[in-house]
Amino acid sequence: MPRTYSLSRYILPALLLLFFLSGLILLRKFYVQNTILVPAEGGTYIEGSVGQLQPLMPWFTVKNDVNRDIVSLVFSGLQKYNPSTGKIEDDLATLTVSDNKKIFTIELLENLYWHDSTLESPHPVTADDVIYTFTTIQDEDFSNSLLRQNFLGVEIDKLSDRKVRFSLVEPYRFFASNLTIGLLPDGAFEGVPISKLDQALDFGFNPIGAGPYKFKGMVQTELSTEVTLERFPRMFGDEFHLERAIFRIFPDYTTLLSDIRNLDGVRLVPRNDQGDPIIPKNFTAAQYTLPQYVALFFNVNNPVLQDLKLRLGLQLGTNKQAIVDSINEKIIIDTPLLEIDTSDWRYQFDSNSAQGALFSSDWHLPQKVRLQRALEQREVNAVGALQVEPIAYLATGAALILTGSTLDTDEGSTLNDVLLEPHPSMTGAWIVALPTNGQTGSILPGENLLKLVDSKGNAIDSAYLWRTTNSKSFKRAAEEQRLLAHFIESRDGSVPFEDRITTADLYIEDGMLRRRLSTDPYDIRVNDKGEKLSLRLLTTENPPQYKEIAELIKKHWEPLGVHIGIDVPKTRSKFEEKLIDRDYDILLFGQSLLDNLDSYAYWHSSNMQQFTDKRSDLRIDAYNLSQYSSLEADSLLELIRKSDTDEELQESLDELDEVLKQDVPAIFLYSPLYTFAYVKNLQGVELGSPSLHSDRFLTLQRWF
């Protein structure tokens, strides 16, 4: 007998299960909403980077970002940059600035100690350390010329054990940024010549700072150089949660990836061929930019590049979008202020506008010379007493018959020394038979200038005539005349835009203009002396995308009639030698503006390279790479440094932007995009708006 089941047997258990699950969900929601995630104290952060470790000193990090990362934690400055606000704030000292922005007075915080301090033998940070750090920079033997330049003319005085005064000759709005460099202890380099400080290995590989982390040790493993830092307790500011920070420095990214399971962060993540960051599994990517730009700097010391129309034409002919696409970048810029200006035609890629600007320059395509001459001949023949149409003739007979009006002639007038005769069938007209056999007045093969003269030998008019006996040559000449008419209509705007032609659409073959074919080689522009427009572009091997950009520039400018030779020195030292010598026409290079966008070092004429009979007079710190000189720009750069308010600053920046826009000393291309990767369980990472790669550690106190 079949069994029967009652539905009520299942309803009650199901309701109980549903009630239980709902309770769990509500309990979890309550827990999440009422729980605050509190950072755990301790732990070790291990970061991998690619590079080479050098002595760890704040004075000498400009060329080594890997060093700068470690130095930023071991050493602290009087001031620090806040990537969240973009402002300079107090760090080891409070800062007071006079109303005239010429006196900067710092007062060290209380209870500041160097890392070699012990309970029995504390080593406090004093004004003597401040004096030592900055007066050493001012010494003429100090090898970091860029850093030294920041303190030229600055008077530094000790006011007390904790107070130091910096007195400037001129107001300088951004001077506080110079006080972010890490302090060094007085006496740490006793016996070391100032010129050799960058080689002080004993201190450099066992540094003593006053930063949030102290140097613990360094070991060389099979895969990397490993530097260990330990948290150093300080009596001010936020407490850091991480007990240790370990930096593993690998020779290349492949070796780094082989150790990825032991890393919590990767400093700079490379990209694949599609431009995507190669993010390791279980890592989070944080992308950021720095106040940097990559540009093409025109060496305006070169007389060729003093032609503004030429520089403008090259800018208009540079396809920035194609460049950033090819190297997998994203951020196009048009100005040294890291801006893009889509409203100004001078920044828009337009090959026709580029040709137009170059048309007005001192450099001409060979076809332009022919075009101008042909247009002049056409204009000459279209007016006056002697109007010859067409200009080109296919004449194989013994004479070429021409006719004209007697309105401007008299009896006895001649054309090419051949007497004019009354026309037998046309009233008020003359006729002449010009020989082709070489006799007096003959019309010879090729170009002829006809001269109409009255009976007294006075010139009445002249005209051009081109003669050939070859039908193929005649067709080329006739095609040239057709193109001339089309060019005039294009110039006048009487044909639709898409049907217009420019000089770049023309090509010379056998001395005649024809329409350019895709298979035709590009012509190189020449000047009135017949010199070809050939420029040399200097760049570096690293980063490798610079060479790719250089090849693209060559490709972009070739149709404009500009030949580019690419110069990539094999060594860094050879490149720097050419850089100092200004041994280039165009330089593809990058510059960093740091936290304040102060462009003085890069565009003020005082930072041009000055050439004398002595090579020793050449400056390493001459950062005006375009050799650009402008009284207006100089004045604005000085005003920017002296500005009292943000409004005054922005007004001067806008005016400087306009001056550089008009002068085109460089073509600004893009601002690089970087990627930092860290494990997903690492909390508190906020990059903000860093000015240096190492600025990611300015929020390290929040990491856990």
Predicted segment positions?
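Detector for C-terminal structural segments
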Residues: 21-24, 28-29, 317-346, 353, ...
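Short, well-ordered beta-strand elements
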Residues: 41-52, 103-106, 130-133, 164-166, ...
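Surface-exposed binding/hinge segments that line
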Residues: 144-193
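Gly/Pro-rich hinge or "lid" segments in bacterial periplasmic/extracellular proteins
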Residues: 180-244, 254-255, 351-362, 476-485, ...
